[in-house]
Amino acid sequence: MQPWEYVYDLLMPAGTPIGEKQFTKYIYLTLAVPATKEFEEKISKGDTKDLELPVYPVAFNTKPAEFKGDRIATKKDLLTRSGLYDDDYDFEAPIKDLEFKSALVPGYFPLAVLKLYFEGDIDAHPEDYGLKPIDGHKWYSSVNGSYKVTNGLLFNVDETKNSDHYSVLFLDENPKEFNTLNGYGVVRFYMDLKNAPPEVYTKAKEECISAGGLYYYDAREETAYCRLPLNKEANIKASEFIHQLYEMIKSKITSEDFLKNEMVYQLPGPKVIPVKPVIGKTFEEMVKTADKYLLLGETAKEETKQETKQETGKEEEEKKETKQESQEQLFNPFAIVDEMLAEGQPAEAKQENSPQQQNPPAEAKQRQQQEENNAEAPQQRQQEENTPLKMNILTEEESNKSEEGQQPLENNIQTFGFKGDIADFFASLVKDKYIFLPILSRRSPSEYKNAKKQRTFKGEAVEEHTEIPRENMKYAEFRKKYSEIVNKYAVPFMHDGIWAILPGKEQELYKELDKLVQEAQKLGISPEEIEFMVTVLLVPKDAVVREINRQIKEIRTDIDEVKQELQNPDLKKTKIASLKKQLEQKQLRLNLLKDLYSTVTKEEIDKLAGKVKDTLYTLNQIAKYAGQQEETDETTEEEEEEEEEGNDTVKLS
């Protein structure tokens, strides 16, 4: 089964309403917990130890309830097609009434409600999908069978009230944008088989399946149907959704609240016993398949991108040259060379391979300096220029060895101001045991003058220096826009005032900040002031993992405390609303940390191309930007003057 097929069988409508080009659906995602034969046999024998039951996502259509904002789902509204999990259990058996009773299994447990916007009346041609006429019988496009998703919202389910035959869903009033399935679509074709010979029936089925479609024969109408993904992106979109759904389910069934209150079995009498939830076999296999499609999709995108760049290489180089010349005196710390990030080659190597490119004098000088710094390791440098960027995953033993002889952890955390184009900085990194994380500091540009005299900040000095009561309006406007952009694409990390860019959001962030920097310079904010706000954090990989784990444990403790407080029956409505808001924010924070952790620890990181390639880098020689590795508190006045002139390093110790 392909990802697009799974998503269709799970939650997509069979067709579009007749005569409607656009329509919406409220789709209720829940967990079904069927009673397996093994489970029933154990219970019948009185064996109540180590009980397990599989959980599977299922989806229901909903209709508006009497009260505004509420939805009703009934057993007749099941969207998930019955054959989806047939290999695992009899899907129809546990589905009788849609009920949620915490002491009963099997049951249904709410995940979320999706509001999906659809566009129908898709113009599709059978020939484009590999469906050709068979002995005079043609395939035709089904008017009400093709559609695509154009937009979406995700609602949390605050509460459910249940009757014998239906469940009322009380939804969160603040839905979140849900665009994972945007662009996912299906097309349907049909062939009239009245009076057709038997071989046409056989060929129609074979042709549909060989084209990668779902075949269905309606005996009453004597018509064959073939449903196919709308385009190549359908599998990628479906794979992304399956991955998100998996994370949602995993988070649900591992929560302490779920394990204590939901997954219990009522024995005869008052006794209840815990039951361990496990991901159902079919869904677990589907997640693995989706992961493969995501990797293949990223690889295909990368190959297409490289082919396009090869065709237009000269054009791009000319544009880049023009841009460099026009911005030679205009400092822009967020400018990025897309070719380098996409192909994983240092910008320097590209310039050497391009006879048409003329380097500005300043850049040539910088290249010469870099060559001198790397003279001691020519073989290593040559090897890195000719190999794609790849993150070294250290074993625990290797990690421990790498720490021997190093300075303490807090002294390994350093920040470095960008110099010139950011691509030059990336090109100077040498792969070894460090992870490179772009970090944005929220320090005010107005600190610049004080910072020039004091180049070393300690502890939480970053936040202490940001309070400037009479800040110029141009700085205030810049800070406001800057803060909005950073909050959109980054998350606080390790120190107050230090932000780590979210995985996969680098390009979007740089583009927005690129525009903002240009606007700021037009307002008269100097390049030096802007440069002071932009830093890079270098942290050993094992330190990143340890810190993320610490924060995850901390935030989980906070979440449990808030949930416990919500159990208080004497709470006022305003307090409940405030606690729910806190819970939502903490859960979001937890999800972001998990994303960052999975990105940092992911093996074969280079295969994920655009998602993390420009987030994670490793390096060996950083003396050029670190100011000879370390500054001490015993720096003389003469050394401080030299720092002001030639070293933009800012260190957090």
From Swiss-Prot:
Region (Disordered): 302-329, 344-388, 626-653
Native species: Acidianus two-tailed virus
Keyword list, A-Z: Coiled coil, Virion
Protein name, UniProt field: Structural protein ORF653
UniProt biased composition (Low complexity): 371-381
Keyword Magnesium annotated: no
Basic and acidic residues biased stretches: 302-326
Any Gene Ontology CC annotation: virion component
Biased amino acid composition, Acidic residues: 630-647
Localization per Swiss-Prot or TrEMBL: Virion
Coarse class of the protein's main subcellular location: virion
UniProt entry tagged with the keyword Kinase: no
